[in-house]
A protein has these predicted regions:
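Short helix-terminating capping/connector loops at secondary-structure junctions
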Residues: 11-17, 56-58
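Intrinsically disordered, low-complexity segments enriched in small/flexible residues
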Residues: 150-199
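Structural alpha-beta junctions
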Residues: 8, 57-59, 165-169
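Short, glycine-/small-residue-enriched flexible loop/hinge segments at domain edges that mediate gating
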Residues: 16-35
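Glycine/serine-rich loop-strand microenvironments at binding/catalytic pocket rims
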Residues: 1, 15, 22-24, 124-133, ...
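Short, small-residue-biased leader/transition segments that mark boundaries at the very start
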Residues: 3-7
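Conserved catalytic cores of soluble enzyme domains
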Residues: 32-151
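Short N-terminal helix-initiation segments at or just after the protein's N-terminus
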Residues: 8-12, 26
Length: 199
């Protein structure tokens, strides 16, 4: 499940804000009528709001994707980070829903869905395709994601430390660096057109 923790009240007044590291392995949030009635949507929105407020208040946030990062669970735990780093491994994926669910929703077989994903990167499940959207700051190639070697741990620690260093050196607390991926050009164009029309 998704867990969040409150930062110390004294930290809100501090000039140097506490760093937040999110380790992300969330297969998805719970689905169902009971969960909706009990307010899972409010819990997820509350988590998103907490992370966004922390980031905007100056807390550097780095997410390390070590497993599945699916649906609302990922949106509420990890997606609001200044930097998202992922392990380059077949077990690490980001998507709105699992393949079987996506196949049902799109009225396709899993095989047809995979064939479609091969030509449309945002539909794909592999982390390399997700990286083309410009949302990841780094892909880490490790020897053994399940049982990391000392070199794997060192690589991850160095990447995380570098990400925090870069965030602290920046003036912006936004997420605009995510708009420059090779497969985000149409999204960027839509934003430009909207900006022109609304100016």
């Amino acid at each position: 499940g998704v867990q969040t923790c409150a930062l110390p009240i004294s930290d809100t007044q501090a000039e140097t804000k506490s760093a937040i590291l999110c380790l992300v392995d969330v297969p998805s949030q719970a689905y169902g009528r009971r969960e909706e009635l009990l307010g899972i949507h409010q819990a997820l929105a509350g988590a998103v709001d907490s992370y966004a407020r922390a980031r905007l208040a100056g807390h550097p946030i780095v997410s390390l994707l070590v497993g599945k990062s699916m649906s609302g669970a990922f949106l509420s735990h990890g997606y609001q980070a200044n930097r998202i780093i992922a392990l380059k491994d077949s077990g690490v994926m980001v998507h709105a829903m699992g393949k079987e669910s996506a196949a049902r929703v799109t009225l396709r077989s899993v095989d047809e869905l995979e064939q479609l994903a091969s030509s449309i990167p945002p539909m794909a499940y592999d982390i390399e395709s997700y990286a083309t959207l410009g949302l990841l700051s780094e892909l880490l190639s490790v020897e053994n994601p399940e049982q990391p070697t000392n070199d794997d741990l060192l690589l991850a620690k160095q990447a995380i430390a570098q990400a925090f260093k870069e965030i602290n050196a920046e003036q912006s607390r936004g997420l605009e660096q995510r708009l420059h991926g090779q497969n985000r050009q149409m999204s960027k164009k839509v934003r430009e057109l909207l900006r022109e029309q609304w100016s």
